[in-house]
Amino acid sequence: MKYLIDTHTHTIASGHAYNTIDEMTRKAAQIGLPAIAFTEHTPKMPGSCGKLYFSNFKVLPREKFGVHRLFGCEANIMDYDGTLDMPDTLLEKMDGGDLSYL
């Protein structure tokens, strides 16, 4: 099977991974992965990124080392109403994301 994209990855910014965005992009290029999505944990996850981190995605190149890069988050569902721990104003600027129940 040939993989086209890894849609759920974390970097050192999430607090429990060991590689940078560029290191992971370079590895994706080495193994022939055409695309990778960075879905860092949102602020309610202890040790993770603050909101400022996510607002800065706009300055990152969407392609590097021949790999298409998507930037998003792994947001937490905070209650039974579906409230997320990331404001819509930031979610709208992201390429995508995942949801978890905290």
Segments (PLM) and residue ranges:
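Alpha-helical scaffold segments that flank or form the walls of functional sites
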Residues: D22-I36, N56-E63
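Extended substrate/RNA-proximal surfaces in nucleic-acid metabolism proteins
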Residues: S48-L102
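Active-site environment of divalent metal-dependent phosphoester hydrolases
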Residues: I12-S14, T42-G47, I77-D79
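Short acidic/polar active-site loop segments enriched in Thr and Asp
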Residues: P34-A35, T39, D95
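Divalent metal-coordination and catalytic microenvironments
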Residues: H8, A28, E40, R69, ...
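Histidine-centered catalytic micro-motifs
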Residues: L4-S14, F38-H41
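Glycine-rich anion/phosphate-binding loops
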Residues: H16-T20
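Hydrophobic "anchor" residues on beta-strands that sit immediately upstream
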Residues: K2-L4, I36, L70
